[in-house]
From Swiss-Prot:
The gene is vIRF-3. Belongs to the IRF family. The lineage of its organism: Viruses, Duplodnaviria, Heunggongvirae, Peploviricota, Herviviricetes. InterPro entries: Interferon_reg_fact_DNA-bd_dom (IPR001346), SMAD-like_dom_sf (IPR017855), SMAD_FHA_dom_sf (IPR008984), WH-like_DNA-bd_sf (IPR036388). It comes from Human herpesvirus 8 type P (isolate GK18). One of its GO terms (molecular function) is transcription cis-regulatory region binding. Plays a role in the inhibition of host immune response. Interferes with the transactivating potential of cellular IRFs IRF3 and IRF7 that play a critical role in the induction of IFNA and IFNB genes. Additionally, interferes with surface major histocompatibility complex class II (MHC-II) antigen presentation. GO terms for biological process: symbiont-mediated suppression of host antigen processing and presentation of peptide antigen via MHC class II. This is Viral IRF3-like protein.
Length: 566
């Protein structure tokens, strides 16, 4: 029976305490649910007080509890059943108190969710709603800090620690002329090019890249050190010749350059391939297998055939494709099913990797990873729910709350808590209901309406409005403003200074978004003579923010920092 939440136990105990039928069973503090009951350590207990435990035992048998759970004395069975079902808890400290010569134990009644109570049903989600709103605001503040700390790309940013003297352009080192190019060592001219494998060509020779009159020395003047006076002039203006581009524009430009070079190579396939790729003749003559110069990025038809014969593969192009290495990493090799039958001859990693037809330069999803219509609609709904116009400053501020029933003040207090729920309470519930417990200040309950705090109006209308306000409002008071999440299904209106388009206009409080109903920055801009508080209207549409006598429930929220400015 441990862990079973038997609400009828709490109802029986509360009814017995309120009836005053048993003299030694009485309340210590009804607001906290503490009471006294005779303990089992007494030798003699009055019969009128012992009758409480006998009636409790009969109630347990009528509710279907097994007799073996009621073994022992009625007082021992009472303590065992109430503690194992989590209905009672012993008070810490002094457990016993002597009343009329009888030792009485101090008990605390634990709350429970009553299914028949409308307020207990909605109180179940209050803890999650409060923590989720605080997490939403915290994520927006962290996102703003990351956006501020994000380094913007600029000319001269180092992409690698080994190339400190060379400026970077879209994570690609830019080739410089002069004495700095001599430090490349054994890397070869191909390692100093951009990702597309294209080297700058002079405008005079752009129309005839394949002409061999001037040789590679005119098209690759950066591989030879120029005179000292020219070096000084060129290095001084190297930043002036470069243009600052963002990542997307730079990648798009490189993509078009790569396409043009591909078309150019296909159109001039009869020319010298080494001459077209821009490799100096002295490098070609001295480059031998195992030498210092790295020319692994260049794949020719001869090298493909030689590697195929050495590997014993009949298909020459397949062998070259297996051994070719993509230095820049910008092209994806695709082998059709006609060339390879069921992946024969390919390594296991190549068979597991999905084949992509085209390369996507942006960071968007692939074709097979694009979301469906249902996911898109769900993301739009969640983005609207978590949308916050201005990122908050996560510093808690004290908030003043004023409540009016038909224009008459019903409650006024100050809340100093990072998040709380303002809701109504069940006027007929007892202390055993979970909706009457504040959960350490999380839940702030509106007072019960009576003749002293209710103005001239329809009492039944006020009762219906308070019933619809059982879920309440989640409120977070920060130095940057007041943030509210509406949990009510009924129509809720508010009058505040945010958004600026609806300044001074009574508008609806959406239940699908977190709204900044009062913004401190907007208050500073408008001046101190304008709106200083936010007014929430529930159950009626007022003619103005000052005349709300005919509205059943009105709540005014005001920050302490704004009050101190007056």
């Amino acid at each position: 029976m441990a862990g079973r939440r038997l609400t009828w136990i709490s109802e029986f105990i509360v009814g017995a305490l309120d009836s005053d039928k048993y003299p030694l069973v009485k309340w210590l503090d009804r607001s906290t649910g503490t009471f006294l009951a005779p303990a089992a350590r007494n030798d003699v207990i009055p019969l009128d007080s012992l009758q409480f435990f006998i009636d409790f035992k009969r109630e347990c048998l009528s509710k279907g509890l097994h007799p073996r759970d009621l073994l022992g004395s009625p007082i021992t069975a009472f303590g065992k059943i109430c503690t194992t079902s989590r209905r009672l808890r012993r008070l810490p400290g002094e457990e016993y108190e002597v009343v009329q010569g009888i030792n009485c134990r101090r008990w605390r009644l634990l709350c429970a969710e009553v299914k028949e109570c409308w307020w207990c049903v909605h109180a179940r989600t209050h803890l999650h709603s409060g923590s989720s709103l605080w997490e939403i605001l915290y994520q927006h503040s962290v996102r703003l800090e990351k956006h501020r700390r994000r380094p913007r790309p600029f000319v001269g940013e180092n992409s690698d620690s080994s190339e400190e003297d060379h400026p970077a352009f879209c994570d690609v080192p830019v080739t410089q002329t002069g004495a700095e190019s001599e430090d490349s060592g054994d890397e070869g001219p191909s390692t100093r090019h951009s990702a597309s494998g294209v080297q700058p060509v002079d405008d005079a020779n752009a129309d005839s890249p394949g002409s061999g009159d001037e040789g590679p020395s005119t098209r690759h003047s950066d591989s030879q050190p120029p005179p000292a006076d020219e070096t000084t002039v060129h290095t001084d203006n190297v930043e002036d010749d470069l243009t600052l581009l963002d990542k997307e524009s730079a990648c798009a430009l490189m993509y078009h350059v790569g396409q043009e070079m591909d078309m150019l190579m296909r159109a001039m396939c009869d020319e010298d391939l080494f001459d077209l790729l821009g490799i100096p003749e002295d490098v070609i003559a001295t480059s031998q297998p195992g030498g210092d110069t790295d020319a692994s990025g260049v794949v020719t038809e001869g090298s493909i055939a030689a590697s195929a014969v050495g590997a014993g593969v009949e298909d020459v192009y397949l062998a070259g494709a297996l051994e070719a290495q993509n230095v820049a990493g910008e092209y994806v090799l695709e082998i059709s099913d006609e060339e390879v039958d069921d992946g024969a001859g390919l390594p296991p990693a190549s068979r597991r990797r999905p084949v992509v037809g085209e390369f996507l330069w942006d960071d968007g999803p692939r074709r097979h990873e694009r979301p469906t219509t249902r996911r898109i609609r769900h993301r739009k709904l969640r983005s609207a729910y978590y949308r916050v116009a201005r990122p908050p400053v996560m510093i808690t501020d004290r908030l003043g709350v004023e409540v009016f029933y038909f224009g008459r003040p019903a409650m006024s207090l100050e809340v100093e808590r990072k998040v709380f729920i303002l809701c109504s309470q069940n006027p007929l519930a007892d202390i055993s209901h979970s909706c009457l417990h504040s959960r350490k200040g999380l839940r702030v309950l509106l007072p019960k309406p009576d003749d002293n705090n209710t103005g001239p109006g329809d009492v039944n209308l006020l009762a219906a409005v308070l019933r619809s306000f059982a879920s309440g409002l989640v409120i977070v008071s920060l130095r940057s403003g007041i943030y509210v999440k509406n949990l009510c299904k009924s129509t809720v209106l508010y009058h505040g200074n945010n958004p600026p388009k609806k300044f001074g206009v009574i508008c609806g409080l959406s239940s699908r978004a977190v709204l900044d109903v009062f913004n401190v920055a907007q208050y500073r801009i408008q001046g101190h003579e304008h709106i200083k508080k936010t007014t929430v209207f529930i159950g009626g549409d007022p003619t103005s923010a000052e005349q709300f006598d005919m509205v059943p429930l009105v709540i005014k929220l005001r920050l302490r920092s704004v009050t101190c400015d007056d």
